[in-house]
């Protein structure tokens, strides 16, 4: 989600358009970050407020129209800019669907204090819904914080990392997010809202929250939710816990934990550990260690639970990262109550220092995704998709790095014990200039495998302009290359062993260097897709549209949707 001091908004003056506005921080007592080095706080995925100054071939097949999901955006002082980090859940009829995203409008007013309207926003996690298969969308804002009074006694304000799922009943949507107390900014851990359609309207009915038993000594981040497709009572949430080490609050490098419900979300049980803190982190009390982040859960056909996540890079005590990382998985045979020993899926070259040049944050998450085939010739096959840099890179995150990255897939036919060698889902990439990343793997009812991903062509702009991006900490990434990004999909009919030619989903290319936003990261940390029947539904961040800011057309980052039949 947005970056650096988590949900801290630096105590510096931040310019919104031409207005100087104080960006507030959560207090040290509430966040526990006072003694944590800045480079280490940036391991977390939290959204931060951002200046809205300038940021600088395939047959379309059966791709449906590209539709903007969110309402038109307005610049300060009427609003704040930026809608990204997308997620989607779709009902069995393929017509009723809910999308979610990080929404910069949530920085207005309490608890963040940005000067804009309205002064009482609902949250940093927006949502929209459609009742006609995505032809039209209604922007719902964010879930009403006052829903929290009825279930947890406080107003629950979502603060990003949105993740949607739909229950096995095909009617109840679950929306997981990080959360804080609306009035005080106190950390609440994770929230899960439940909602449903009634006619042509959608509403959230209630919310539950859960947090580390050790309270502010630990910090929850990057949650993701999955539901059991065969039992509406069961769902799990995996997350990263930056836990206390050696008496130092929130000083760990990430432990992967899981919470579960067996009553449809009325109560949540946990946490249990799927990926223990890495031994080097524990041995050095978190002064140096190996990052664990970006977990995603999924249910198998027999009720088993799999969780995948990124392990690495390893950081020195001064914050210098290694170039290597790996993808791991853990399995539970009792619905998420306990997990076996984690298993390595594959080694990777971390993308941390190899982001698209138009990305407005100094570091980049690898973020693997997971699915399980529950039909077809390969029923029970577990699939994990992930990106990897073409070659290891340790270049400075302030420099433009044009080394290519690719999307790979591995699969397991023995419940995650052993894994196939990773192979590209969309062919090879050159050594420089093409970045494929943030894949989402989904499966169809007939057993096909679908992978949606971003592809960025890192090249000079036709007008010869530089890409000039603020990346936090007073730093900029400046250079001649731009990030020209499209959303694509590949499909496999043999269980992920081979894929057809890529299909371009986005009907217009986004220049990530041109998006004008009030959030960091400008395009989020992941994208969303779901497959129902044989149709894949995708939502992504897109900067094709412009609005007038002080009389000048400026690109803004919206959420776009399309289906692929």
Predicted regions and their residues:
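Bacterial N-terminal signal peptides that target proteins for export
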Residues: 1-10
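C-terminal PAP-associated
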Residues: 29-565
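Sec-dependent signal peptide cleavage junction
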Residues: 22-30
